[in-house]
Amino acid sequence: MSRLAKKPIVLPQGVTVEIKDNVVKVKGPKGELSQEFLPYVKIEVEGNEVWVRPNENQIIRKSDWRKIKMFQGTYWSLIRNMVVGVTEGYKKELEIVGIGYRAQLQGNTVVMNLGYAHPVVYEIPSDVKIEVPAPNRIVVSGIDKQRVGQVAAEIRAFRPPNVYTGKGIRYVGEVVRQKEGKKA
């Protein structure tokens, strides 16, 4: 049994979990998330706890246990992330480093000047909220951890930090190791 799945996911006040077929829906104060799971594990709601247990019907060979234990831990983490997302939400902060590098919101897009000959325009997805509190800072927030991380990674990919100068878009708190330049 997965070490994570040995303990239940405790549901906070105001969070409900529905399981129909292999789809888990989590509703909370910030919104609703749903995820489809494979039938390797049984997901059960008991009071205000969610248990992820192995599905004995899926075990044909002894070697299937390893696969089922892997899915059990993964699904436990995914459901836990959904519960945290609908209660607290997720947030990633990016900082833009470089002279003349800046970002601004224009309607449903983020327009970034990143040292290219043209401004970079990124359209904001509907399930994620983006704020620009300062010209050199971008805050990506939402209820789905995977989507928030994906959008932040897409924005960072427009100009990742340069290993020689450190210029570019980086996560707040990210340490960029700089290489030494050429020796003359």
Curated annotation (Swiss-Prot):
One of its GO terms (cellular component) is cytosolic large ribosomal subunit. PANTHER family: 60S/50S RIBOSOMAL PROTEIN L6/L9 (PTHR11655), LARGE RIBOSOMAL SUBUNIT PROTEIN UL6M (PTHR11655:SF14). Keywords: Ribonucleoprotein, Ribosomal protein, RNA-binding, rRNA-binding. Pfam families: Ribosomal_L6. Part of the 50S ribosomal subunit. The gene is rplF. InterPro entries: Ribosomal_uL6-like, Ribosomal_uL6-like_a/b-dom_sf, Ribosomal_uL6_a/b-dom, Ribosomal_uL6_bac-type. This is Large ribosomal subunit protein uL6. GO terms for molecular function: rRNA binding; structural constituent of ribosome. Belongs to the universal ribosomal protein uL6 family. GO terms for biological process: cytoplasmic translation. The lineage of its organism: Bacteria, Thermotogati, Thermotogota, Thermotogae, Thermotogales. This protein binds to the 23S rRNA, and is important in its secondary structure. It is located near the subunit interface in the base of the L7/L12 stalk, and near the tRNA binding site of the peptidyltransferase center.
